[in-house]
Amino acid sequence: MKELVILTGHSGAGKSTAAGLLEDLGFFCIDNLPPEVVYQVASILSNNVDKLAIVLDIRSYLFGNIQNAIKDVKERYPFTKVLFLTAAKDTLIQRFAHTRRSHPLSKQTNSIGEAIELEFEIMKEIMEIADLVIDTTMLNPHQLRTKLTTFLEEKSEKTFVVHVISFGFKYGMPLDADFVFDARFFPNPFYINELRPKTGKDEEVKEFLRKIDGVSEYLNKIYELINIAISRYETEGRKEITVAIGCTGGKHRSVYFAEELGQMFLNKDYKVTIEHRDVELG
């Protein structure tokens, strides 16, 4: 089966890392193409290349109409997937300061902040039509690889995808979550010596939380609410939802809720991914 990915996004958001991961997954990667040759390059799929990734950065946008180029490619290759990487603006500024690299738009602006603002404005229409937008603000390369693999495994006739994330509030909320739920008002297993080193995936912690009044009801209410949202999302043509559940450190309560909620959606034959973002930190 032929696969074509157009990888784009904001400068500093991790396109080079993502391109390297795509190469590890067997993709032939070509980057920094002007719009007028994107369609021609895509045609190499007709030869001996089965998996092609075309990487476009802001410089490609400045050469012409990227949106039309992507439209032309999608008309010929309907299986084309557009992947857009972004990150919080403050994070992008920090990344450029750390690497001491100049922003591609730095000559057209007075500061790195202005360059990033301009880039967001130029790229906003492509971001809106992307098949998947990944916020890399809190992602490490392993987590990015997991998201890429999940994205590529989804078939055109795929069912709705439910992404469930557990996290610790003290490490910040996931910026790409559609819904965020708080589990901090339930008793914390952290304060029980024998449960402290364990996680919400361990049976002892599960048993402790199951016995707490309100836990089961809260879980069911979250499930009911997300089901309502999914039905509306599907009506609007959306194909995925990201649900985040947090506790203090992201090790016990949120992990338990994420695992239980993920299983509930698996039982409905949705495609489900479960990520425990901070379980090693909590």
UniProtKB/Swiss-Prot annotation:
HAMAP family: RapZ_like. ATP binds at residues 9-16. GO terms for molecular function: ATP binding; GTP binding. InterPro entries: P-loop_NTPase, RapZ-like, RapZ-like_N, RapZ_C. Keywords: ATP-binding, GTP-binding, Nucleotide-binding. This is Nucleotide-binding protein Fnod_1159. GTP binds at residues 57-60. Belongs to the RapZ-like family. Displays ATPase and GTPase activities. It comes from Fervidobacterium nodosum (strain ATCC 35602 / DSM 5306 / Rt17-B1).
